[in-house]
């Protein structure tokens, strides 16, 4: 039993050994077989790759050969074309050279002909010179004049004739130009006058204030005339109370004073309370109202003309012109009219319309303060325009509008013409009123020339002048001497009919407030 088991064990062991050995060699055989197969496949792949590389190499070589062949053909074609172009250029050059040779030959022939003609001309000139010399000698012998003398005589006669003909021609041209210019100027001026229709209002030196009843006259006069004296002293106007029913008259050559007095008196009559303190309050209030109105009037005038950007002080001065007259003509309306006329004529001549209007509006601006500042209104206007930085052409228009200097611009000439047109219209001005006003202004200016004078008022149609002095500078004794000195200067400087009463008023006020 044990032997059987041992035999079985040996058999099994041998079987296992044989199986393992066979398995080992079988697997080794399979592995070697696979390796050989893989090596064969690799060799095959390498062979195929080598064949493909060889084929690709041949293909690339063929393409390169084809490219080289094509490039060679293109280069040969380009060379052939360039050669043909060079041949054409060469043929043209040869043709041009042949033409140049022909022209050179022709030029040489012409030059030869010219030389021959030049010789002939020189010979002819010599012959002519000889003939001329003989003729000159013969003429000198016959006329008794040398050639230089004859030349001078001939030139003198010709120059005189040309000068005479030129003078006639210039005179004719000047006459034609003047006629044409006059015709054109008349057309422009007539057109400007037709387009500009301005109102003419004759200014007066009196204003009438209506009253509710005649009893109001007594209240205006006041106790012992204190109200009327206070009113006249503060306003600087004459208050005339006569038999005119329900009305009193304010008389003054200064329209601004008269307007202030009219407004103040109207307010006093409406209020009903009339006494010195109230009169002073109302006069001051009226002055402020008139100042505001002056500003508004100036703005309205500038707006009406279409002039913008004026300095506020120039606007105020324009408004003051409403209360200023020149030979009876309202200066503000005159200035607006001049601006319109100058603008219309500038439009016709195609020059600067706004410059012409601005110069026309401001040309008489000096008249707004000429009774306060010494000197002609033109110089005052120029100084004001410079002070408020107006354009130099506007300043020139103001300076040239009365012909004090020669106008250098077309606009300045137009302002000058417009000023003359506005002033020369029938009924626009009255000489008598202006002369009267100027006499009163001179009367006030004489009094104001003394130191210590605060305000002056010429009243009673210039037969009386009231001088309000500064009490801190002029005492009572000095007031007497001042009145005498002013009267003497008036006698010396002014011509006037009759007598002028000089009244010096000195007032001292002490004001305290109870708290």
UniProtKB/Swiss-Prot annotation:
<dbReference type="GO" id="GO:0006402">
    <property type="term" value="P:mRNA catabolic process"/>
</dbReference>
<dbReference type="Pfam" id="PF01966">
    <property type="entry name" value="HD"/>
</dbReference>
<keyword id="KW-0472">Membrane</keyword>
<comment type="function">
    <text>Endoribonuclease that initiates mRNA decay.</text>
</comment>
<comment type="similarity">
    <text>Belongs to the RNase Y family.</text>
</comment>
<dbReference type="Pfam" id="PF12072">
    <property type="entry name" value="RNase_Y_N"/>
</dbReference>
<feature type="domain" description="HD">
    <location>
        <begin position="331"/>
        <end position="424"/>
    </location>
</feature>
<feature type="domain" description="KH">
    <location>
        <begin position="205"/>
        <end position="290"/>
    </location>
</feature>
<dbReference type="InterPro" id="IPR022711">
    <property type="entry name" value="RNase_Y_N"/>
</dbReference>
<dbReference type="Pfam" id="PF00013">
    <property type="entry name" value="KH_1"/>
</dbReference>
<dbReference type="GO" id="GO:0005886">
    <property type="term" value="C:plasma membrane"/>
</dbReference>
<dbReference type="GO" id="GO:0004521">
    <property type="term" value="F:RNA endonuclease activity"/>
</dbReference>
<feature type="transmembrane region" description="Helical">
    <location>
        <begin position="6"/>
        <end position="26"/>
    </location>
</feature>
<keyword id="KW-0255">Endonuclease</keyword>
<dbReference type="InterPro" id="IPR006674">
    <property type="entry name" value="HD_domain"/>
</dbReference>
<protein>
    <recommendedName>
        <fullName>Ribonuclease Y</fullName>
        <ecNumber>3.1.-.-</ecNumber>
    </recommendedName>
</protein>
<keyword id="KW-1133">Transmembrane helix</keyword>
<dbReference type="InterPro" id="IPR017705">
    <property type="entry name" value="Ribonuclease_Y"/>
</dbReference>
<dbReference type="GO" id="GO:0003723">
    <property type="term" value="F:RNA binding"/>
</dbReference>
<dbReference type="InterPro" id="IPR004087">
    <property type="entry name" value="KH_dom"/>
</dbReference>
<keyword id="KW-0694">RNA-binding</keyword>
<keyword id="KW-0812">Transmembrane</keyword>
<dbReference type="InterPro" id="IPR004088">
    <property type="entry name" value="KH_dom_type_1"/>
</dbReference>
<keyword id="KW-0540">Nuclease</keyword>
<keyword id="KW-1003">Cell membrane</keyword>
<dbReference type="InterPro" id="IPR006675">
    <property type="entry name" value="HDIG_dom"/>
</dbReference>
<dbReference type="InterPro" id="IPR003607">
    <property type="entry name" value="HD/PDEase_dom"/>
</dbReference>
<keyword id="KW-0378">Hydrolase</keyword>
<dbReference type="InterPro" id="IPR036612">
    <property type="entry name" value="KH_dom_type_1_sf"/>
</dbReference>
């Amino acid at each position: 039993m044990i032997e059987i088991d041992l035999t079985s064990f040996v058999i099994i062991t041998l079987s296992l050994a044989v199986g393992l050995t066979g398995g080992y060699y079988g697997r080794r055989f399979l592995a070697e077989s696979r390796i050989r197969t893989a090596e064969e496949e690799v060799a095959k792949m390498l062979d195929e790759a080598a064949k493909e590389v060889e084929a690709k190499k041949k293909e690339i070589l063929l393409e390169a050969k084809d490219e080289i062949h094509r490039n060679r053909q293109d280069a040969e074609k380009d060379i052939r074309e360039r050669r043909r172009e060079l041949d054409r250029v060469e043929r043209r050059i040869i043709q041009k050279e042949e033409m140049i040779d022909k022209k050179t030959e022709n030029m040489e022939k012409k030059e030869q002909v010219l030389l021959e003609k030049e010789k002939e001309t020189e010979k002819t000139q010599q012959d002519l010179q000889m003939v001329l010399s003989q003729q000159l000698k013969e003429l000198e012998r016959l006329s008794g004049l040398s050639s230089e003398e004859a030349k001078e005589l001939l030139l003198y006669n010709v120059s005189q004739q040309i000068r005479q003909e030129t003078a006639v021609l210039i005179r004719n041209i000047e006459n034609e130009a003047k006629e044409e210019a006059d015709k054109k100027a008349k057309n422009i001026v007539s057109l400007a006058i037709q387009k500009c229709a301005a109102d003419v209002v004759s200014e007066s030196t009196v204003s009438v204030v209506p009253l509710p009843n005649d009893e109001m006259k007594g209240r205006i006069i006041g106790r012992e005339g204190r109200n009327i004296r206070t009113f006249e002293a503060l306003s600087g106007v004459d208050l005339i109370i006569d038999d005119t029913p329900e009305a009193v008259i304010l008389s003054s050559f200064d329209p601004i004073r008269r307007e202030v007095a009219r407004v103040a008196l109207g307010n006093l009559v409406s209020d009903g309370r009339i006494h010195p303190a109230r009169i002073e309050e109302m006069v001051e209030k009226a002055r402020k109202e008139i100042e505001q109105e002056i500003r508004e009037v100036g703005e309205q005038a500038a707006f009406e003309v279409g002039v913008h950007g004026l300095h506020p002080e120039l606007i105020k001065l324009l408004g003051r012109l409403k209360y200023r007259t020149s030979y009876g003509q309202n200066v503000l309306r005159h200035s607006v009219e001049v601006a319109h006329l100058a603008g219309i004529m500038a439009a016709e001549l195609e020059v600067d319309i706004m410059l012409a209007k601005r110069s026309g509006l401001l040309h008489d601006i000096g008249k707004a303060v000429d009774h306060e500042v010494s000197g002609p209104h033109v110089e005052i206007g120029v100084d004001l325009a410079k002070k408020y930085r107006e354009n130099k052409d506007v300043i020139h228009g103001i300076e040239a509008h009365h012909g004090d200097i020669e106008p250098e611009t077309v606009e300045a000439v137009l302002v000058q013409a417009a000023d003359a047109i506005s002033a020369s219209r029938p009924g626009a001005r009255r000489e008598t009123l202006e002369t009267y006003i100027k006499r009163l202004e001179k009367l006030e200016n004489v009094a104001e020339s003394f130191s210590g004078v605060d305000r002056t008022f010429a009243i009673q149609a210039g037969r009386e002048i009231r001088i309000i002095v500064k009490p801190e500078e002029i005492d009572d004794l000095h007031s007497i001497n001042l009145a005498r000195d002013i009267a003497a200067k008036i006698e010396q400087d002014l011509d006037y009919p009759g007598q002028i009463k000089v009244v010096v008023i000195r007032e001292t006020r002490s004001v305290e407030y109870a708290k």
